[in-house]
Design a protein with these regions (language model features):
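Conserved donor-binding loop and adjoining core beta-sheet/short helix segment
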Residues: 17, 34-109
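Conserved GNAT acetyl-CoA-binding A-motif
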Residues: 110-121
Length: 199
């Protein structure tokens, strides 16, 4: 049996531990990062568990980072994406059950009539994890309203720079711009924080 409940602040450690081992999660889905937007959105994130045997010791199998806006649930209103975060053991069949349970919970417990679902781009998965895309169409009768683009740089097979890109890099160097790798996240976080506040 699948059970669904809303996330509470008391669940933060369990949430983050699940995100750390999930097959399709990124740091954006950690509660510390998601909490950055807590003053702008009403959190309606869900925790989905499988209950076996006598109902004791439910096992967390999925998370749905989400915000609620009236009778609309968005996955996630404050992030670029926020689809179903899945355990590595989840099967397509179980994912169908998960979405059926989420649908029932949202309709009956939260008064949700519409869901905007932004899946986690496959480039961030540690292993294939698109069961949610199948289940949301099959169970929820979802339809695609739009597509977003996700870009990445493949570090082990870099594309060659164009001549224009070389000129731009040389110009940046002449003007004192440097790019360097560091383990100190403080400077990056300051730039990120300022950019997010400007939005």
């Amino acid at each position: 049996m699948i059970t669904v409940r809303r996330y509470t602040d008391d669940d933060a450690v369990e949430w983050d531990a699940f995100v750390a081992k999930a097959k399709n999660a990124t740091f954006l889905l950690m509660r510390g990062y998601m909490g950055y937007h807590s003053d702008r959105f009403i959190d309606c994130s869900l925790m989905v568990s499988e209950v076996k045997d006598n109902g004791k010791n439910p096992m967390l199998v999925a998370l749905l980072p989400a915000t609620i806006h009236g009778d609309e649930l968005r996955s996630h209103g404050g992030l670029t994406y926020g689809g179903l975060v899945m355990d590595s053991e989840i099967t397509a069949e179980m994912c169908l059950e998960v979405f059926a349970a989420i649908n029932d919970f949202l309709r009956n417990e939260c008064g949700v009539r519409r869901v905007v679902y932004k899946p986690i781009p496959w480039i961030y998965h540690s292993m294939p994890a698109e069961e949610d895309l199948y289940a949301i169409i099959k169970v929820c009768k979802a339809r695609i309203l739009g597509r977003d683009i996700a870009s990445t740089i493949q570090m082990d097979n870099r594309l060659k720079f164009t001549k224009l890109r070389h000129r731009c890099v040389n110009k940046a160097r002449r003007n004192g711009i440097r790019v360097e790798e560091t383990g100190d996240i403080t400077a990056f976080w300051h730039v990120l924080d300022n950019n997010l506040m400007a939005k």
